[in-house]
Amino acid sequence: ILVHRFQSRSSSFSLFPWVILGFWLLFFPNAPYILTDLFHLTKRIRVPFWFDLSLLLSYALTGLMFGLISLLHVDAWLRGRQPSWMVSFLIVGVLFLSGFGIYLGRYQRWNSWDLASNPMALLYDIADRFLNPFSHPQTWAVTVLMGILLNFMYWCIRSLQMEPVVSRK
């Protein structure tokens, strides 16, 4: 939304929207990450399980939907500047990258702010996974599965947005 708001009306290149886009990308995985909080659901004596489930699911789905809506905005903004095939390729990549971010948050306990507060340790951890991929099968399993899930959800929502609903009278 900020990119749309502050973009230059002229045809000249402006760095500002791309900086905003970089910050958006840094925090985007937090939206689908909330789904992994469902792993913490346990039966408790004083609180009904259905209450915890409905509360957590409502927050997780709301976060996911707002995240995917923000991606729709980024998609539309990029399509005005880049070839459609390139934007589709980038969107698929962003969603798999988000799967990797979800893995880093859920299993390695890193978060977006660690890029500023502890960048070397975070970059070392990321580099280790790329330099020694066979030593980290869980990394790639979670990344691929979450990437597939996020891509499935995003492209379903995008196809609904693109196709008008026809009613018959």
Task: Annotate each PLM feature.
Residues 56-65, 129-150:
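Hydrophobic alpha-helical transmembrane segments
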Residues 38-39, 104-118:
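Interfacial helix-loop-helix junctions of multi-pass membrane proteins
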Residues 114-136:
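Short, membrane-exposed interhelical loops at transmembrane-helix boundaries
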Residues 21-26, 90-109:
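Hydrophobic alpha-helical membrane-insertion segments
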Residues 2-9, 31-42:
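Transmembrane alpha-helix boundary signature
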Residues 65-77, 143-167:
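Transmembrane alpha-helical segments in integral membrane proteins
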Residues 4-16, 76-86:
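Membrane-interface helix-boundary motifs at transmembrane edges
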Residues 47-79:
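Alpha-helical transmembrane segments and their immediate interhelical/interface regions
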